[in-house]
Amino acid sequence: MKLSNRSVICTAALFAGLASALTPRHNSASSLKHRRAPVQSRRVQSLLINVDAQPDLPTVEAATAAASAASLNLDDIQGDVLIGMKKNQELFYFFSIANATDFKPKLASDILPLITTTTQLLSVNTQPTTALNVAFSQTGLTALGVTDALGDSAYAGGQFSDLKNLGDPGSTNWVPQFTGTGIHGVFLFASDTEDNIDAAVASLEAALGDCITKVYTLQGAARPGTEAGHEHFGYLDGISNPAVDGFVTSPMPGQAVVAAGTVLLGESGDTVTRPTWAKDGSFLVFRQLAQLVPEFDKFLTDNAVVEPGVLTPQQGSDLLGARMIGRWKSGAPVDLAPLFDDPALGADPTRNNNFTFVHPDAALATNQTRCPFSAHIRKTRPRADLGTPEDAVHHIMRAGIPYGPEVSDDEAAANTTSTERGLAFVSYQANIGNGFRFLQKTWADNANFVHAGTGVDPIIGALAGAQRVVSGLDPTDSTKTLTLTTDFVVSRGGEYFFTPSLSAISGTLAV
């Protein structure tokens, strides 16, 4: 890993490093459709990772047919919005607009031709060397002279003013650059090597010159080897993203199917009045979430589930972690594998999401022998707990990536984090109040959801630094509570952005 101005130290505001990159593809023209001519193949392998346990992306042909039937234009939607957590390397480049008069024409001439669409990402033949997307904060749109309200109060106020709704204990732990509203936008670079991303960044910086100012960067990467697709605690991630109508044609069993307007503004299912130009854009929530992995592992060891003659101490530790998450590290849900991991189940996308928490031999409202009410995946997607069919309003498209190095031997031995690592959390939704913020505030942070006395989500639940108590983690005694003495996930801040369609950039933001 390169250590430069991107390296991250847990106790300071030095930043993380790993990578992504970009190459110009075509010349701009008057028509968006004709400007984005077919790209000559330059790849022999995808810039995306392929994790067997995650639902496959649709083929170009299938997605195009589905989009046509739903009147979606995948050539106008930025690629990261619908693709999900399949990036190999990714760099988040946060910037402010120093000179809007100079930036706007360059947005049209230098940035827009490089933006990677959904269609392009679906095939190796059309993927660029490095994918590029861009999104703007409310202050960024204001700097560009865009005064239309987008109909989302959380976005309009910015994440820093939303601290209390997220359970953050003030901004003490925040990266200083995220405090206030000084970040106007973010470039997302994605590729399969650091060198590609570094080249792309250098090229874009040269083109934009001093009309923007780099504020902060955070570099992420899929974890190495068999850990690809797993977050730093070790659990397989990205399994439960919904299937968006008009994009996914064959949802996996148990995969939630949501209207396009759950993610995209102005589409079917979006009930808020929006400016016409905002159609097919999406609100991007970015959160830098540090993970205290050695401390988490020590907690599991010290509080392992005890079943003499059934579980070894290590198995008891693994079971506690699985019940806190709601899945084993393989991705197998504890609702289907309640006592021991089942890697074959975890690796099978036709089975690893096919559950509702309903079992004929157990009362849904009281039984926690399989999956605790407080488990992370149950808190954030309650499934049958809220009745059937499942309410799809509060679904989000998650598109984050791990950042920071693997745990060192010294950290593991000391049970203490010395170098920051975590998740660069990204979610897309058409309504932050119904999406990310609802999941965090109303479900994860609510000690009385799904039922009174459940406790907070033991992974992401936050109470502004106050002590967190969780129940149901011991399968032999669901009334037993466990006090979490450490926040194993620490918010380092973030911002709310709007990811516009390509036509919105050319027709509104860049004029």
Which residues does each PLM region occupy?
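N-terminal secretory signal peptides that target proteins for export/translocation
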Residues: 1-3
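Cleavable N-terminal signal peptides of Sec/SRP-targeted secreted and luminal proteins
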Residues: 5-21
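Long, low-complexity, Ser/Thr/Gly/Pro-rich intrinsically disordered segments that act as flexible linkers
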Residues: 22-511
